[in-house]
């Protein structure tokens, strides 16, 4: 891929349904991927296993959005025992950090005190969110980040959550696999949707009582582009089906759906 490949080229790739990867974190080259079959997480059928619902109800981590984007990408690219090598190299970190500064890439972070213990990142275009990678340094941290992401996407009017490939880790959340043509048809429709990751939606009004606590809760960062407080209403619904829950509204609503 050309050394001149920049953020605008990356956005153009996503609009076409392709995405970049590297052979390894030490290889500076990138290549484009256009899978024959695509893994997606249908937002209207997002499933949370019962054990994880109980875990989310316990509010074990403080969850934030876009407060440590580059740290999340770098953590996703760290090798570990089960994954000695990764596809996230320095050009990937730099490209997605540039998209984040432009407002097109976002992260979800899970914190235990001041320690970043899990999270994920991806790209937002129209009503589509393209999940890129996730990491976990504590029990269920990446899963909880994904639940909060799904709740936010539902709350903000998104219609497509792309997981790129079939991943056994994600089948518990309702992952399905569709053909390339079917994915691109869904993508074409999703790009016409005016969803906003940090803006309002046509749904219920935000619960302005949701904020940040030292041990748990949900928070937004504040940037010059402007970010609204996280309502949590979609997640409330998903949780509520599994029993009483006093946490964020979006968490409760999304568990009602499960």
From Swiss-Prot:
Reaction catalysed? N-terminal L-lysyl-[protein] + L-leucyl-tRNA(Leu) = N-terminal L-leucyl-L-lysyl-[protein] + tRNA(Leu) + H(+); N-terminal L-arginyl-[protein] + L-leucyl-tRNA(Leu) = N-terminal L-leucyl-L-arginyl-[protein] + tRNA(Leu) + H(+); L-phenylalanyl-tRNA(Phe) + an N-terminal L-alpha-aminoacyl-[protein] = an N-terminal L-phenylalanyl-L-alpha-aminoacyl-[protein] + tRNA(Phe)
User: Where is this protein found?
Assistant: Cytoplasm
Ranges of compositional bias, category Low complexity? 209-220
Report the source organism. Answer: Hyphomonas neptunium (strain ATCC 15444)
Coding gene? aat
Protein name, per record: Leucyl/phenylalanyl-tRNA--protein transferase
Q: Which UniProt keywords apply?
A: Acyltransferase, Cytoplasm, Transferase
A GO molecular function term, named singly, is: leucyl-tRNA--protein transferase activity
User: What family is this?
Assistant: Belongs to the L/F-transferase family.
* Region Disordered: start-end pairs: 199-220
């Amino acid at each position: 891929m050309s050394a001149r490949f920049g953020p605008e080229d990356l956005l153009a790739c996503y609009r076409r349904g392709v995405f970049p990867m590297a052979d390894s974190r030490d290889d500076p080259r990138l290549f484009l991927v256009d899978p024959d079959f695509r893994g997606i997480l249908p937002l209207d059928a997002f499933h949370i296993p019962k054990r994880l619902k109980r875990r989310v109800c316990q509010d074990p981590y403080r969850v934030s959005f876009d407060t440590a984007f580059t740290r999340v990408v770098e953590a996703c690219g760290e090798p570990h025992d089960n994954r000695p090598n990764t596809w996230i190299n320095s050009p990937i970190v730099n490209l997605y950090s540039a998209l984040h500064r432009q407002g097109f890439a976002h992260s979800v972070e899970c914190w235990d005190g001041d320690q970043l213990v899990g999270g994920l990142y991806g790209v937002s275009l129209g009503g589509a969110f393209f999940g890129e990678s996730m990491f976990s340094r504590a029990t269920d941290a990446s899963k909880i980040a994904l639940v909060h992401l799904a709740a936010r996407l539902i709350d903000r009017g998104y219609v497509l959550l792309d997981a790129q490939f079939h991943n056994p880790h994600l089948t518990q959340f309702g992952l399905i696999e569709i053909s390339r043509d079917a994915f691109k048809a869904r993508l074409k429709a999703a790009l016409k949707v005016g969803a906003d990751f940090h803006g309002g939606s046509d749904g219920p009004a935000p619960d302005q009582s949701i904020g940040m606590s030292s041990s748990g809760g949900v928070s937004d960062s504040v940037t010059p582009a402007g970010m609204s407080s996280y309502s949590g209403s979609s997640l409330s619904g998903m949780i509520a089906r599994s029993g009483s829950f006093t946490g964020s509204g979006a968490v409760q609503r999304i568990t009602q759906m499960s």
